[in-house]
């Protein structure tokens, strides 16, 4: 446990809550006093990490609630400026994240996919929790704070995260700083720009998302899109510039309706398991059969593979089932609800 603060870690706790409630007929027994205390802590962290580096009135550096600094020979394993991280501007509505989903330090601290993830989960918490519980003075206060964050983050993403790219047009940047700085890239780990429809921020047909998707899945649009003779996909700085992550191809499948793109991506991930039949963390794009890989059994990616197959069972059954089963309409959520 490294104490690396990531906004998506907080959002994931809310994801777990929302999915529990939505799949168990909104059984509110989980919303205990302990849960409320945890939720209040999340709001406190969001408040603190929404502060700019400099006081807008005096221009002086403000006190910092979170610092991360350590001796390392890897630049992405610590934060600059004495552990503070690079400056962010005020009045953006966005929330800082010191690290990305796989522990690499952010360059510009407003991590866009993480803010999108948090925004969507806060909206669902209002619908799944606050709209259903008995209101008290305390829950009313928490609801008001939640709604303010929803408004602020939504506006912040609209005003700062969408940037006009000289080649790709209006796209979502991976990170921004509120000063006009924007980082054009994507990382395989979720949440990512590629996964924005799954965060609930937008639909996969959204024109800005479509521009963004083309950018991050292009060698000349995303510095971490890696392509070799045997494998291709989005990688990231965590492993290096030779390895793409199967996870990115699974997300590619879930964000398209194109049968050819889906089948090509499925073939890539199935042909690069090094004979183990399991998803790896990353695969060297120049490795035949995926024999040069990291982590032989990466639980996160195996879970994403299972999720992808369930997605195809509902939306594209003809691509994965024999003909006699391909015309069956599958309702996976209903099936799981029956099992639970």
Task: Describe each model-derived feature in a short phrase.
Residues 33, 40-119, 131-132, 140-245:
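Extended ligand-binding clefts on enzyme/binding-domain cores
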Residues 138-181, 200-304, 308-340:
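Non-catalytic carbohydrate-binding regions of carbohydrate-active enzymes
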Residues 23-26, 128-131, 135, 315:
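Alpha-solenoid helical repeat scaffolds
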Residues 34-36, 136, 323:
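Compositionally biased, intrinsically disordered low-complexity segments
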Residues 1, 102-109, 289-292:
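Short coil/turn segments at secondary-structure junctions
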Residues 1-75, 298-313:
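Aromatic-rich carbohydrate-recognition surfaces in CAZymes
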Residues 6-21, 111-126, 184-200, 240-255, ...:
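Well-ordered alpha-helical segments within folded domains of soluble proteins
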């Amino acid at each position: 446990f490294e104490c690396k603060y990531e906004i998506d870690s907080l959002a994931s706790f809310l994801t777990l809550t929302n999915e529990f409630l939505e799949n168990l007929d909104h059984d509110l027994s989980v919303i205990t006093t302990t849960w409320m205390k945890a939720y209040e802590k999340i709001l406190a962290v969001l408040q603190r990490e929404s502060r700019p580096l400099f006081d807008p009135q005096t221009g002086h550096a403000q006190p910092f609630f979170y610092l991360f600094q350590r001796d390392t020979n890897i630049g992405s394993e610590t934060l600059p400026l004495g552990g503070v991280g690079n400056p962010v501007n005020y009045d953006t509505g966005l929330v800082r994240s010191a690290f990305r989903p796989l522990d690499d330090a952010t360059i510009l601290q407003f991590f866009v996919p993480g803010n999108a993830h948090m925004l969507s989960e806060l909206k669902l918490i209002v619908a799944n929790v606050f709209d259903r519980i008995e209101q008290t003075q305390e829950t009313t206060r928490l609801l008001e704070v939640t709604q303010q964050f929803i408004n602020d983050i939504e506006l912040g993403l609209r005003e700062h995260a969408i940037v006009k790219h000289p080649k790709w047009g209006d796209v979502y940047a991976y990170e921004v700083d509120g000063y006009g700085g924007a980082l054009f890239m994507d990382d395989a780990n979720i949440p990512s720009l590629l996964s924005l429809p799954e965060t609930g921020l937008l639909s996969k047909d959204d024109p800005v998302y479509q521009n963004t998707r083309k950018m991050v899945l292009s060698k000349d649009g995303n510095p971490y899109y890696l392509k070799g003779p045997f494998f291709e996909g989005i990688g990231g700085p965590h492993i290096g510039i030779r390895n793409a992550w199967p996870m990115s191809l699974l997300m590619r499948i879930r964000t398209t309706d194109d049968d050819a793109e889906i089948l090509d991506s499925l073939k890539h991930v199935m042909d690069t398991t090094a004979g183990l039949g399991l998803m790896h963390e990353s695969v060297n794009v120049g490795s035949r059969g995926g024999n040069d890989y990291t982590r032989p059994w990466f639980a996160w990616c195996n879970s994403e593979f299972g999720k992808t197959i369930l997605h195809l069972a509902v939306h594209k059954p003809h691509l994965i089932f024999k003909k006699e089963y391909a015309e069956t309409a599958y309702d996976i959520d209903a099936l799981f609800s029956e099992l639970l």
